[in-house]
Regions:
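Extracellular glycan-interaction surfaces
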Residues: 3-31, 51-60, 74-134, 211-240, ...
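Extracellular glycan-recognition modules
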Residues: 33-85, 116, 170-175, 240-299, ...
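Extracellular, beta-strand-rich glycan-interacting domains
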Residues: 47-58, 112, 154-184, 203-207, ...
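Charged, alpha-helix-forming regions
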Residues: 206, 448, 456, 465, ...
């Protein structure tokens, strides 16, 4: 069987750029069980540094959650109000910011100097004390994930920890462990390159802490007949003799990442179609193996196709030692012989299968083993020999390090059949990977074991369920086991929980659920507000529902029965797959229903995984992070990420950040908020982070002054006010001009009063505009089509008109103001939520608090198209001789969102999923009079503090601090107040722009 045929060389995609430093594993902590205890007492001394990544889970406000503590003294913990406290006795630092974003990761650094303490979150200083003294330390117990010396159930962490460094003797800042990404701006990890001091440690909670158990098969032995490094070498006679791992390991599923496979070989027989190292059991294109092809080249192959050969026949190396190395570096595959590169090729091939690693042949595809000797076989998860540079192969034994995932020495007696993997350590969850062996032990009781090592990390964030994301009735499940177990709360009501990721409507996706008992459903739903009282599905929403218990297994779509008796029962593993919008339901790895209704029916509404429980019913879920405790997870997705109980369907992916679609635009290039203090001068330049400013909205924060709005189409010296209906004014003391990334203001108190504080919201469009004749009336348009935003000016006429907007699709928000006369601002959008419809047969007024007004003459009762919006005969939008400006927007994934939500009237308010961390939000009730246009941003609120700061678009008053609670989160916006201005039981329109897409955001 020609498994290594040189004529089947596989083409590959263009080389991908490097991903930077990757964190591979985290450790899940929850409830009364989780903590790790240092094996010996610990006595810290200042200075020291602690660096750790944390992802929060259940926000149990009734208890303190310790990340670490030493002997009732130094500690780091989340308080009952979710602030962060660091104690270094006798001083305690407590943040004003509240940290309760459970959808993503925080990085925390404690920098301790002899007379100062500095606390950082995500690279930014959040609290400090520069006049403190350190308490004399005494040696004592140290715990990770719980109180010390004795952890109690009400002090343990609910969440995940990753990459824990304690650097003893040195005070370091966050720049030693992370950096701001130059493109997206999020804080990301870098590899720490320093030491830890004799008492310090590094706990990566990584799979590298586990050795692979190796077994000799057939006549494979250690032999003293040939030696390269030690007293013996590994002898493989041929045929199916081999040394193999006792179990499959995900370690060798490289995905698209870097690797090195190397070793010393001594062929006694040079034969084609023989293998050296094998990681396959089938001809899958996602498996890999290395051996001799039909031209006597050493080659790496996948399936039955060679992806790189040595281009050098190996006959010349018969009966002598030769060093072979295959590497991949940032998408380039290379092969070296004796340290010299012999060939290379672009390869981003995805090696995703989990199989037993084998030295020699003997796989199910009939590949025989290379006959001869091997020594110092090493596999690494990085590229050790970069750039094609010639190197001298080591003639001494390799030393294990954190990048080694397999290392087999041979230095033993003749004919020994004991083979040992010398990679990693034989320690435990808390193995110290520094040079100090300052290990931590798991508790003597409970289930804290290696199955709690998870794939969810700061460099690959996985979906889980989201306590902030409740159902429309504000019912709440119990959240257990890192938010991966839902329900069990009792009672006589149904409760829904939603995942913190949406399911993309394109691509292939897979997720699993184990039913633990009771009346329970799984499914996909487009919004918590898709279902009204009586299970009525709102127009434009979708609900894919699998009742797995109550009716013996019934499939529903939008509450309509699709199939009955398809299978039910507790203890089973159920699954959902989505293939380009086609939804399938599974039970025990078999498809029980394929929906004819495509996910695209949800339109712009995000679709989330949902579980429903009644009474004491419970679900356990796995999005691929590897819930090995209860799911027995083992199979990665098609990209090699995660672990599932069953092998996902072909090409299907886990819901994790690495798999999310790449955002099309960088938000900070299209919207920017600037805070500045006025100087009273007549010509003040304000600089933004945009390449060009085309629309600016300025408001004084510290006093009562009009809002000022100017743009490059009308000209910098022409101004409108959002807070009244007055006509456009012209003058040089307000916003004077635009120039690239800057705009200039004069001395007017609304934009530049001496000592006054201001906020400027800035959008990039496309300069001063150009003529557009798509409509019945000619318009001038400055359109940023990639960002879905445009400025339009036009002149009115008698009758009804259409106006070209310049965007690539229909806008979902149009704001129009008459420039020539005093008339109301008109706001149109299309929203349908819980019985309230806004659809361009009505309007809101930006300068007023009134609710929707139904009227046909503003928009001519006509929704926008991909080229025009419509206006009727109302003078606010169309009148002979009047001039107008319109600001048009549509949602752009990862950058902007125009949507609606249903307030729940609770202090634990509505969560609005946006798919990004918001930078700016404006919202207004559609069906409540006397509710304001609330405007807020991430600069007015640099941290979540429980009481947001905002302004009112229709009101000239100063900013309103500490009045309405809300949180900016990594994937949306959470309301924490009951006011009619943001969260009474009415329906709200919102407009939001992003700081970062969810794929590239930190927890906030």
């Amino acid at each position: 069987m020609g498994v290594l045929n040189e004529n089947s060389i596989m083409g590959s995609a263009a080389a991908a750029g490097g991903e930077g430093y990757q964190i591979e594993r985290s450790l899940k902590f929850y409830g009364a069980i989780p903590h790790l205890a240092k094996a010996s007492n610990f006595q810290p001394t200042s200075p020291y540094t602690v660096s750790v990544w944390v992802k929060r889970a259940s926000l149990d406000l009734g208890r303190t959650q310790f990340l670490w503590r030493i002997n009732s003294a130094d500690c780091l913990y989340f308080t009952t109000s979710s602030t962060l406290s660091w104690e270094r006795r006798p001083t305690t630092l407590t943040t004003t910011g509240i940290y309760r974003d459970t959808a993503n990761w925080y990085h925390i650094v404690c920098k301790s100097e002899s007379g100062a303490m500095y606390l950082y979150v995500n690279g930014s200083l959040v609290s400090s004390n520069t006049s403190t003294t350190a308490n004399p330390y005494t040696s004592g117990a140290m715990n990770i994930g719980g109180n010390a010396p004795t952890p109690a159930s009400n002090t343990c962490l609910d969440g995940y920890l990753a990459e824990f460094h304690w650097v003893q003797g040195t005070a370091l800042g966050p720049e030693s462990f992370g950096e701001f990404d130059s493109k997206w701006g999020h804080w990301k990890p870098i590899e720490y390159e320093g030491g830890h001091g004799s008492e310090g440690f590094y706990i990566p909670f990584s799979g590298s802490s586990t050795k692979h158990s190796l077994t000799a098969v057939g006549s494979a032995v250690h032999s003293t007949a040939q030696q390269k490094i030690g007293a013996s070498s590994i002898y493989i006679p041929g045929a199916a003799e081999r040394v193999e791992a006792s179990a499959p390991s995900i370690d060798f599923a490289f995905g698209t990442g870097d690797f090195t496979i190397e070793g010393w070989l001594y062929w006694t027989t040079v034969a084609t179609d023989k293998t050296w190292i094998v990681n396959r059991e089938s001809n899958s294109s996602n498996a890999w193996y290395i051996g001799m092809d039909t031209s006597y080249y050493i080659a790496m192959a996948t399936g039955n196709a060679v992806i790189l050969n040595s281009n050098t026949a190996m006959n010349a190396y018969h009966n002598q030692w030769v060093h072979i190395a295959f590497t991949r570096q940032s998408g380039t595959l290379r092969v070296y012989i004796n340290g010299v590169q012999k060939n290379s090729a672009a390869s981003t091939h995805n090696f995703s299968l989990t199989n037993k690693i084998k030295l020699g042949g003997g796989d199910t595809q009939g590949a025989g083993s290379m006959a001869g000797y091997q020594d110092e076989v090493r596999i690494s998860k990085n590229c050790r020999y970069p750039d094609g540079t010639t190197f001298t192969p080591s003639t001494t034994a390799f030393a294990e390090d954190s990048d080694t995932i397999l290392l087999v020495h041979s230095d033993t007696s003749n004919n020994s059949t004991t083979f040992v993997d010398s990679s990693g350590t034989t320690g435990d969850l808390g193995s110290d990977m520094s040079a100090n062996s300052n290990n931590f032990n798991r508790p003597s009781s409970g289930s804290m074991d290696s199955t709690h090592i998870m794939h969810d990390t700061p460099t690959n964030n996985f979906a889980k369920f989201h306590k902030a994301h409740k159902d429309a009735q504000n019912n709440d499940n119990s959240y257990l086991d890192g938010d991966l177990q839902l329900g069990g709360g009792g009672g006589t009501s149904w409760r829904e929980s939603f995942a913190d990721f949406e399911v993309p409507k394109t691509g292939k996706w897979y997720m699993e659920f184990r039913h633990l008992g009771g009346y329970a459903h799984i499914g996909l739903m487009s919004s918590p507000y898709a279902v009204n009282t009586g299970d009525t599905i709102q127009t434009g929403h979708v609900w894919y529902d699998y009742d797995t218990q109550q009716t013996g297994g019934t499939i529903f779509y939008n509450n309509s029965n699709q199939a009955s008796s398809v299978g039910a029962g507790s203890g089973e593993v159920y699954a959902i797959s989505v293939n380009e919008g086609v939804v399938k339901m599974y039970k025990s790895n078999s498809v029980v229903h394929t929906y004819s209704q495509n996910l695209s029916n949800a339109g712009e509404h995000p679709v989330h995984p949902i579980v429903q429980t009644y009474g004491t019913a419970e679900w356990r879920v796995n999005f691929g992070q590897g819930d090995m405790d209860a799911m027995g997870a083992k199979a990665p997705d098609a990209n090699g990420y995660g672990s599932f109980y069953y092998t996902p369907p072909a090409d299907h992916l886990a819901l994790c950040s690495k798999n999310l679609p790449e955002p099309t635009i960088v938000p900070t290039k299209h919207f920017d908020t600037v805070l500045y203090t006025g100087d009273g001068g007549s010509d003040r330049t304000i600089t933004t982070n945009l390449s060009a400013v085309d629309l600016v909205w300025v408001k004084v924060r510290s006093g009562s002054e009009d809002h000022r709005i100017a743009d490059t189409v009308r000209g910098g010296n022409k101004h409108l006010k959002s807070n009244d209906n007055s006509a456009e004014s012209t003058g040089t003391t307000i916003i004077k001009s635009f120039s690239g990334a800057t705009f200039n203001v004069g001395s007017d108190g609304s934009v530049n009063g001496n000592g006054s504080n201001y906020v400027a919201w800035n959008w990039k469009m496309n300069g001063s505009g150009s003529s557009n004749s798509n409509g019945s009336t000619t318009s001038t348009v400055s359109a940023n089509t990639s960002a879905g935003q445009s400025i339009v000016t036009y002149s009115g006429s008698s009758g009804n008109d259409t106006v070209g907007h310049g965007l690539s699709q229909a806008p979902n928000l149009v704001i129009v103001k008459s420039r020539a006369n005093a008339d109301q601002w008109r706001v149109g959008s299309i929203q349908n939520i819980a019985g309230t419809t806004m659809d361009f047969t009505d309007y809101l007024k930006l300068n007023a608090t009134t609710d929707l007004t139904d009227e046909s003459t503003t928009w001519n009762d006509t929704a926008p198209t991909s080229t025009v919006f419509s206006v009727g005969s109302d003078s606010a939008t169309n009148h002979p001789g009047y001039t107008y400006v319109a600001y048009c927007f549509h949602s752009v994934e990862g950058y902007s969102k125009i949507g609606s939500y249903y307030g729940n009237g609770s202090a634990d308010g509505t969560f609005i999923y946006m798919g990004f961390k918001p930078a700016w939000i404006m919202l207004k009730s559609m069906d409540t009079s006397y509710s304001s246009w609330l405007v807020t941003d991430n600069k007015l609120n640099p941290t979540n503090d429980g009481a947001g700061t905002n302004l009112w678009a229709e009101d000239s008053s100063a900013e309103n601090p500490n009045s309405y609670g809300y949180d900016f989160l990594s994937n949306g916006f959470k309301l924490r107040a009951t006011s009619s201005n943001l969260n009474n039981t009415s329906k709200f329109l919102y407009i939001a722009f992003a700081e970062q897409p969810f794929k590239y955001s930190n927890a906030r």
